Regions:
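Structured, contiguous alpha/beta core segments that scaffold functional sites
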Residues: 2-276, 280-289, 293-296, 300, ...
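Short acidic alpha-helical/loop segments enriched in Asp/Glu that coordinate divalent cations
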Residues: 295-305, 330-343
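Generic long, charged, amphipathic alpha-helical segments
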Residues: 335-357
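Short, amphipathic alpha-helical "recognition" segments used to contact nucleic acids or chromatin
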Residues: 365-370
């Protein structure tokens, strides 16, 4: 069947390219009720509505968001240029000052990146407006609230960004003027909120915390009660007196004293208390699992030891922080550089400080590098934030252990030694 016959056959039978439907299915980014899966919205299984605002009030969520966002914000971020001599800092590039020091007139680089990560962790997406000069040079970056942004596609399939300001006005921003960093998502365009995806786990944490608060504020259990042998004449008076005397955490464990022949009955439920505490402990680990944060970084030292905390921290840097850094770097490289600059300039975080081990391990590593000739004294001093040694004093010299030689040189040396030994023996015989 020829190409024309094939086309005629498709038109007659109504067949279409099977991939067309796939592309149409992802035309609208999945950030709205009509496009997002049903599990994305609604209350949690514990009956609690989970939003970014309610979730951040849970101490474990706040601690996880804070430790990730502050760690990323504290890492040095710079612009580099790939040259024939290697990769060098491009401190003269306009983006260097924006990313390293001050992205706009209202905030520092630390605050900007901290906000950016908080948006990613709570909403699944980070948006920043790119301000350019008349020469198309980036002169400012301003973070935008993710829950005020609507992302869609126009009739031509191009992405559109519509932002709703605090006074209710809508502003359409061109895609080239938006630094959009998506988190984990299903369509490659929009990220999903970890809070919404894991609403059941977080909702259970909110419910258990609310239960504990209400228990101690309104229903603190006394150590015992007295029962009346007959019908109580004025239940309301007894109830009001009870709440006044034994309600609230300050009155917990007091013995209830009533009159008219009442008998004392101890009241205790240690099993329920233990289960409640276990539930709260489990939810701490569960929420840490969502954000991939070691529990000891949020104050849970139950399973931490002096020998494993360092390795857990390095694991946090490798498996939690680094993926976020790569996601941010690639999004910035795509959105902030011109087509002529891409491939030559790039954005990169410096993770050296985060990956540093204890002092003894660092010194042993430096010694190996120094003795094997692939680090100079100044290379080591730079990593330890110390001033360099002048080059004339050997600060940039590369040294190797004098006992280490090439295998071929060793074989040649042995052959020469054997020759000299034979010559000496012959001379003695001849003498």
């Amino acid at each position: 069947m020829t190409g024309k016959q094939d086309q005629d056959y498709k038109e007659e039978t109504g067949m279409k390219n099977p991939f067309t439907a796939l592309f149409r299915a992802r035309d609208k980014p999945q950030d709205s009720v009509s496009a997002a899966p049903l599990f994305y919205f609604g209350t949690s299984g514990a009956g609690k509505s989970v939003t970014a605002q309610t979730a951040i009030q849970l101490s474990t969520v706040y601690a996880c968001v804070r430790v990730i966002s502050e760690t990323v914000a504290s890492l040095p971020l710079g612009v580099y240029e790939a040259t024939d001599q290697g990769n060098e800092k491009a401190q003269d590039h306009p983006l260097y000052r924006l990313l390293h020091d001050e992205p706009n007139a209202e905030m520092t680089s630390f605050v900007f990146r901290e906000v950016m990560l908080a948006h990613l962790l709570l909403y699944g997406n980070s948006y920043s407006q790119i301000i350019r000069s008349g020469k198309n040079t980036v002169v400012g970056l301003y973070p935008l609230l993710p829950d005020h942004m609507d992302v869609d596609r126009d009739s031509k399939g191009n992405l559109t960004y519509t932002y709703t300001t605090s006074d209710g006005k809508t502003v359409v921003i061109k895609p080239q003027d938006i630094l959009h960093i998506p988190g984990l998502g299903f369509d490659g365009v929009m990220g999903y909120s970890p809070i919404a995806l894991e609403k059941n786990a977080i909702g259970l944490g909110i419910a258990s915390e609310e239960y504990g608060s209400k228990f101690f504020s309104n229903g603190a259990r006394p150590s015992g009660i007295l029962t009346h042998p007959n019908t109580v004449k004025n239940p309301k008076a007894v109830r009001d007196s009870w709440n006044s005397a034994y309600g609230g955490s300050s009155n917990s464990n007091r013995v209830a004293i009533l009159e008219e022949g009442m008998t004392f009955t101890p009241l205790s439920s240690p099993n329920n208390e233990a289960q409640f505490l276990e539930t709260r402990k489990f939810q701490v680990d569960e929420i840490c699992r969502i954000f991939r944060v070691p529990p000891h970084l949020v104050g849970n030292l139950e399973h931490a030891t002096f020998s494993n905390i360092e390795h857990q921290s390095i694991d946090f840097a490798v498996h939690t922080i680094r993926p976020w850094l790569v996601r941010i770097e690639q999004s910035m490289n795509r959105a902030l550089f011109t087509e002529q600059e891409k491939g030559r300039f790039y954005v990169q975080f410096n993770m050296d400080g985060l990956m540093r081990g204890d002092y003894k391990s660092r010194m042993e590593g430096y010694a190996i590098a120094r003795q094997n000739g692939w680090m100079s004294a100044n290379d080591i001093r730079a990593l330890e934030n110390q001033n360099p040694i002048p080059a004339e004093d050997g600060g940039d010299a590369l040294l190797v252990n004098g006992n280490m030689i090439l295998v071929t040189s060793a074989m040649q040396s042995r052959a020469e030694d054997a020759t000299r030994s034979t010559t000496k023996t012959d001379n003695r015989k001849g003498g």
